[in-house]
Amino acid sequence: MKILRRIFPFLLLAYHLLFAWIGYQFILTHHGDAERYWFLGQDLSASSWIDFLKPGTDVVKFLSFPLVKFFNLPFWSGFLIFSLLSFAGVLILYRTLMRIAGSNVKLHVLAVVLMLLPNLHFWTSLIGKEALILIPLTVFCAELSRKRYFSVWLLMSLLAVAVIR
């Protein structure tokens, strides 16, 4: 069981990145918000980075804008970047669940099963708010589980959720 606990985060990363590739293929075929967030087919010559410094969905555009305009990163790289960002939230959630499970093997198994639910990985691996909001949500849960009701991290996570949503 100890070996699994050590390797599982790496397997979880591979699993999460697999969903980034699946999400990329899905958006290429079915289209979606990710195309808008990555400014596909849009002329950015008259746009400024500061134009997107607003709460809500513009937060995603604010983060994507320099990657597209200044670095000319391809569409697939957005999925990789947002997926890696959201994986930080997945990892926080996994560690929180493992800490809560303690030495209870059944709870460890349940936590592993929960961490493998496809929806958690698919929606948070796309370019969008879901990827960004996962970190503050999991930080919020981790802080509550530790009974840190007024910590700086908890308050910052609430602020981040408010800005992103």
Regions found by a protein language model. Give the residues of each.
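Transmembrane-helix motifs of polytopic, lipid-linked glycan transferases
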Residues: 80-101
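Start-transfer (signal-anchor) and selected internal transmembrane alpha helices
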Residues: 1-18
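Transmembrane helices and adjacent periplasmic/lumenal helix-loop junctions
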Residues: 131, 156-165
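Transmembrane and membrane-interface helices of multi-pass
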Residues: 108-118
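Residue-level hotspots within the lipid-embedded alpha helices of multi-pass solute transporters
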Residues: 53-54, 82-87, 162-163
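Membrane-interface transmembrane helices that cradle and orient dolichyl/undecaprenyl
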Residues: 100-101, 138-151
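Extracytoplasmic catalytic/substrate-binding loops of multi-pass membrane glycan-assembly enzymes
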Residues: 26-40, 49-64, 72-73
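Short acidic/glycine- and proline-prone juxtamembrane loop motifs at membrane-interface regions
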Residues: 125-130
